[in-house]
């Protein structure tokens, strides 16, 4: 019997939010939808290199790769009290959204880590992406994804 080498997008999202970043604290928040989109996109590209299927389709957009399905899942998980979105106003950045798991989300992520065989293979990769990019300046992160994957940058017509 051949093992299925795929993971659901929503599970990837939970694991990304659960993972520590540079702070080494579990459930380190991800600041901004753009950052969340880019980190998940980069994770999926690394999974693709390992032959693991993923579920979020990304399309070209102004700020690079964008997934409507990811936005939909975030809204659903907020509604289900799995993800908490805190909206803060910054003098320098305008309105900013901060994403992290709720207690319910932490339980679900922990269950994934103990009950999903493929997670043991991919979780170290997820932690590495979060550690590397979660505190990177957002402009630099967008430029990085533009440079690495120019096919995901929407061409502005004018």
PLM feature segments, named:
Residues 1-158:
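Domain-edge interaction signal
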């Amino acid at each position: 019997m051949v093992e299925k080498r795929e993971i659901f997008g929503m599970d990837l999202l939970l694991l990304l939010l659960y993972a520590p970043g540079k702070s080494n604290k579990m459930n380190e928040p991800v600041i901004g939808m753009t950052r969340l989109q880019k980190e998940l996109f980069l994770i999926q590209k690394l999974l693709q290199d390992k032959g693991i299927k993923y579920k979020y389709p990304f399309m070209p957009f102004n700020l690079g790769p964008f997934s409507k399905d990811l936005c939909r899942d975030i809204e659903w998980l907020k509604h289900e009290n799995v993800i908490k979105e805190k909206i803060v106003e910054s003098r320098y950045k305008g309105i900013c959204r901060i994403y992290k798991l709720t207690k319910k989300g932490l339980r679900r992520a922990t269950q994934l880590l103990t009950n999903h065989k493929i997670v043991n293979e991919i979780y170290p990769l997820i932690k590495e992406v979060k550690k590397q990019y979660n505190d990177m300046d957002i402009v630099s992160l967008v430029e990085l994804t533009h440079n690495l994957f120019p096919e995901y940058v929407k061409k502005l017509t004018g």
